[in-house]
Regions:
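Internal acidic/polar
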Residues: 77-106, 111, 130, 169-170
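A short, charge-rich alpha-helical start-of-domain segment used by transcription regulators
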Residues: 1-20, 24, 33, 112
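Structural recognition of an alpha-helix C-terminal capping motif at a helix-to-coil junction
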Residues: 20, 34-41, 45, 53-65
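C-terminal flanking helix
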Residues: 15, 19, 40, 114, ...
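A short pre-motif secondary-structure segment
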Residues: 120-124
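C-terminal edge and immediately downstream basic/flexible tail or linker adjoining helix-turn-helix-like DNA-binding
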Residues: 1-8, 78-81, 136-139, 153-171
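Arg/Lys-rich amphipathic alpha helix in sigma70-family domain 2
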Residues: 64-81, 151
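Helix-turn-helix DNA-binding motif, specifically the short coil turn and the N-cap/start of the second
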Residues: 28, 130, 139-144
């Protein structure tokens, strides 16, 4: 099997998961796609990959690192400032009567979480990873993962407490 075929196979298997990770870090669909593409390009050009663990975890770690690098960058800070400045002016005019389903509301609440509790919530509940797997992936103690999950749930509870969930009335 050629390198190109191997890369295509890796992309077919892992793109969706890596995209979700990148999106939950960046909150931007196009940027998440770009980051995942960059991860695969970087992996392809690595001449010395040593298989020490699971490929899924290795690519996830590359994606997380790329996202964190971007979030530290000047480009990100400049775009964030511009977005906040200009959307505040528009948001006064924007009417919040747009209906959204519960999943959209929950996804948005997750995206509002600070990065550390958000990544724990995403990996545990959306990626269905164990606390041990999350600890290994993020290179932190299991107790820290539990603390971040607890903090994330507390913040979500506060954020979502005033929403009347339709699903509660269909039973």
């Amino acid at each position: 099997m050629s390198d190109n075929e191997n890369l295509e196979q890796l992309m077919a298997i892992h793109t969706e998961q890596l995209f979700r990770i990148a999106y939950y870090y960046t909150k931007d669909l196009q940027l998440a796609e770009d980051i995942v593409q960059d991860v695969f390009i970087k992996f392809y050009h690595q001449k010395h990959y040593e298989e020490r663990g699971e490929m899924k975890a290795y690519l996830a770690r590359m994606t997380i690192n790329k996202c964190k690098d971007y979030l530290k960058s000047w480009t990100y800070r400049k775009i964030t400032f511009q977005h906040k400045f200009f959307t505040k002016q528009k948001s006064v005019l924007h009417d919040t009567l747009i209906l959204q389903d519960e999943q959209d509301l929950l996804d948005e609440a997750i995206l509002r979480l600070p990065i550390k509790p958000r990544e724990a919530i995403v990996y545990y509940y959306l990626e269905e990873m164990t606390i041990k797997e999350i600890a290994e992936l993020l290179e932190i103690p299991e107790g820290t993962v539990k603390s971040r999950l607890r903090k994330g749930k507390e913040l979500l509870k506060v954020d979502l407490q005033n929403i009347e969930w339709e699903v509660l009335f269909h039973g």
